[in-house]
Amino acid sequence: MPKPPFFLSWIDLCGRLPQRRYLDRQDRPRRRYALFFSLLTLVLGFTYLLWLTPLVLQNREIPDFLFLAAEIVSFLLVGLMAVDVWHLRGHRPEGLSPDRQWPVDVFVPCCGEPLEVIKTTLSAVKRIAYQPREVYVLDDGASRQVAILAESLGFHYLSRPEAGLTLQDCKSGNLNFGLQHSRGELILVLDADQVPAPDILQKLVGFFNQDRVAYVQSRQAFFLPKGDPFYNADRVFYETMQLSNDLANAVVSCGSGVVYRRQTLEEMGGFATWNLVEDFTTSYEILSRGWRSIYFPYVLSRGLAPTDLVGVYRQRFQWCLDTMRLFFWDNPLWKRGLTWTQKRHFLIIMLSYLASGLAFPIFYAIPLLVYLRGYSFLQGYELPYGVLRLAYLAATILMFHFLFFQKEPLKQFKMLCSLFPVHALAIATALLHPPGRKPSYRVNNQLPFADQGRWWEVAPHLGFIALHLTLPLISLWQGWALPGLILFNSIFSAGIIWILGDLVLAVLEKPKWSPAMDPRQVYG
């Protein structure tokens, strides 16, 4: 029977947790600090909420209730991370040797991507050092050039339009079309822009020696400009959260660089078609049926990521929309077949979107209301509030530092805060699209080499920044609020400007590329 997280936490702090897994012993110092500050954050956060709640109930105004709700959502997210993310599972970089030569089908779904991108990917697929394998180019774009390219490389070419079929269910429908016309026991899925390493199958196939392993997801990586201004690398997720998910058997399929067992897919009727894209929902359904998932935390393929904010918005909107449709209409708390640990890990992802789209905008707006109204329910309680909130914040920062050690958690936090417009829209869209009413889908990376952004892409951010810069001065000049309250509130305004300013600067600055990472050179 699995031990509860806090029991494991206690025995690890006492130095009595067996160090059996790869890198467990080396990771122990980081893990113990992460545990300590996680527990401290839980205690301080709970104490802060216990102190804050009576003040809000005493005042009974809508903005104050919204502020309390935002604090509770944030605490729930932090709390789940504190409980479930401290222990990671590692794997040896050489992977596992297969006990036999599993027949593998490689699926490369396409839908109108530039020919040079598809050509680079297929040329790399040709160099994959594994047999037996069959490659299927699944072209929903029905491109004659792609067909000629696939045939010249000795690959199978399948196209739903040429077969007289509609493009129903987009990528998931395309993959299911390939599933019907292939027979390999394992299936490697690669997006049209994902350039695989020659040893990708050699390192992943061996994990299927183990019973009930349904899929193995390798770490995602991308060709990125210097500084990665939009944090497309997402090291917090790919280098920490997924390792924690691995330990909990809750690995999220990313839809590319992933190998599936055909038996699993056929058992559930193919790739999931309920959502916009198949990855998250397919893994969610597979795990609820009692199968196992594995995360291989090393880069075995590299692809394109959005280089302008419009592309980032479109991609993150789709991710958030799919996740929140599950939250509203197939919530993990009520999902049969998932363990409580798996439920918590899925809820972390869902709560991060709720915090970004709903809670954070409340934090941005509350100080502005104080400038306008000249009143705060915290008036007269500034000192205890400052002490409790700063202690809670400091513990949270230290917790994130050790949970996501050297993974740029501050950059990830700022990006999550800055994506509030698109996440709020995705949450609302998810509510309006129950089962049977699927949202529309648009393919990403059809124009992958975009450059500098435009100011209107960050209009909401510029609006908040402008208001936080001007309203304190206007409120002081007009006498709307007392100078002490304006000064106290200005601390929050400064923090909000600091958080949102990063994305504004990233959009207005032209990306700089190193030769090895420049997509124009990689993809010709």
Predicted segment positions?
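Short, acidic, metal-binding catalytic loop of nucleotide-sugar glycosyltransferases
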Residues: T121-P132
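Long helical/loop segments within the catalytic core of UDP-sugar-dependent glycosyltransferases
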Residues: S159-L186, P198-L276, L287-S288, L309-L351
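A conserved acidic beta->alpha catalytic loop
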Residues: D139-A147, E162-A163
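N-terminal membrane-anchoring/stem segments of glycan-assembly enzymes
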Residues: M1-R100, A150, S356, F360-F363, ...
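Acidic donor-binding loop at a coil-to-helix junction in glycosyltransferase catalytic cores
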Residues: L276-T282
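Cell-envelope/extracellular polymer assembly enzymes that use nucleotide-activated donors
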Residues: W102-D105, E134, T281
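Catalytic donor-sugar/metal-binding loop of nucleotide-sugar-dependent glycosyltransferases
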Residues: S283-S301
